[in-house]
Amino acid sequence: MIIHPKTRGFICTTTHPVGCEYNVLEQIQSTRARGVRSNGPKKVVVIGASSGYGLATRISAAFGFGADTLGVFFEKPGTEKKPGTAGWYNAAAFDKSAKNAGLYSRSINGDAFSDEMRAKVIEIIKSEMGGHVDLVVYSLASPLRKMPSTGEIKRSVLKPIGVAHTSNAIDTNKDQIIQATVEPATEQEIADTVAVMGGQDWELWINALAQADVLAPQTRTVAFSYIGTEITWPIYWHGALGKAKADLDATSRRLDARLQFLGGGANVAVLKSVVTQASAAIPALPLYIAIVFKVMKEKGLHEGTIEQADRLLRERLYREDGQPAAIDEEHRLRLDDWELREDVQAACKVIWEQVTNENLFQLTDYANYKRDFLKLFGFERADVDYDADVNPEVAFDVIEL
């Protein structure tokens, strides 16, 4: 079929398999250009491995350190009539490239919140990965979670706490600045958001792996978080999602203590704002990202997901000098350090106050934001012919759970 982008709200409903594959190849080349190191992770599990930061970290571990990787994700394959999800094509492209490079790659498609998935991962570690892993990356961004004990479905919300919040935002369909108001979360919504996006499931994973004795000496685990800046704090860090991220921080300290017996440890890694399917859904964030990208590009500080993942592994968790990673007072690895520089944020605040419909494209990097967003789904690549016939059915070596 011939596939062009179709967008609805903040999602793109079509995907391009060739474009997605080229996106993955581009990230692989970016990592390889930094050189391959041997003093890093050897056997890696990535929970949430098919897009965004999870995919980038899997690429960085495999192609930057030669690691064996097991990726867990929940994606839909394409059919004759309909393309699959971008994550399906990303995972397929990763698997193909890893195997071509002689690297071990295993993928499981299913519900990462389920006990069945944990059991399957443990089984594969024991039967195929030499019995132990030394890095567990937790990178799930999900709107809902089926509780493993009861089967109850909990949903996360992107809402402030206490009072409604109104701020500038972009209507990405009309390319216009609007005032978006979000009503506050209820107590139940806050609790459910913590259950979905907090540290509970991460802890279940690490406990299950520890009990099964599949964690190697000096095992590290890392979960991803975002704090942002005062522009986005009311909706994010001071909102329901912030409560979930605070729970993630508390979980990190518990897991760090738990892994001491192995000489290992746990951290939350706070990452920078990037264009992902997850961030596009957060009110005010696309406008802020369009501004901060403009400022950081002008200062030569811009990074995408793969640059952040490489810096996480190469300059934090696995430093060449063997020293422990620098952490903040909350025990977190900070990779939002460049974004939060005073000069960067001061420039962002000025633009935030000045931006209008008339100057949106001049003052911000909004044109590239839109391009980057469509690129997530395999579009807007100069090296892909989007009028050519393409097969939406891409098969690869994946275990369906």
Swiss-Prot record:
Which keywords has UniProt assigned to this entry?
Fatty acid biosynthesis, Fatty acid metabolism, Lipid biosynthesis, Lipid metabolism, NAD, Oxidoreductase
Residues engaged in binding NAD(+): 48-53, 74-75, 111-112, 140-141, 245, 274-276
Keyword Lipid biosynthesis among UniProt keywords: yes
Any matching Pfam family: Eno-Rase_FAD_bd
Q: In which pathway does it act?
A: Lipid metabolism; fatty acid biosynthesis
Active-site residues are Y236
Reaction(s) the record says it catalyses = a 2,3-saturated acyl-[ACP] + NAD(+) = a (2E)-enoyl-[ACP] + NADH + H(+)
Instruction: List its EC numbers.
Output: 1.3.1.9
Matching entries from Gene3D superfamilies are given as: NAD(P)-binding Rossmann-like Domain
User: Which GO MF term does the entry hold, naming one?
Assistant: enoyl-[acyl-carrier-protein] reductase (NADH) activity
Instruction: Indicate the annotated site residue(s) for Plays an important role in discriminating NADH against NADPH.
Output: E75
The UniProt entry, under InterPro entries, shows:
Eno_Rdtase_FAD-bd_dom (IPR024906), Enoyl-CoA_Rdtase_cat_dom (IPR024910), FabV-like_NADH_b (IPR050048), Trans-2-enoyl-CoA_reductase (IPR010758)
Identify the NCBIfam families for this entry: EnoyACPredFabV, PRK13656.1
- Quaternary state and interactors: Monomer.
Q: Which family does it belong to?
A: Belongs to the TER reductase family.
> Would you tell me the protein name for this molecule?
Enoyl-[acyl-carrier-protein] reductase [NADH]
- Species of provenance: Xylella fastidiosa (strain Temecula1 / ATCC 700964)
User: Its encoding gene is what?
Assistant: fabV
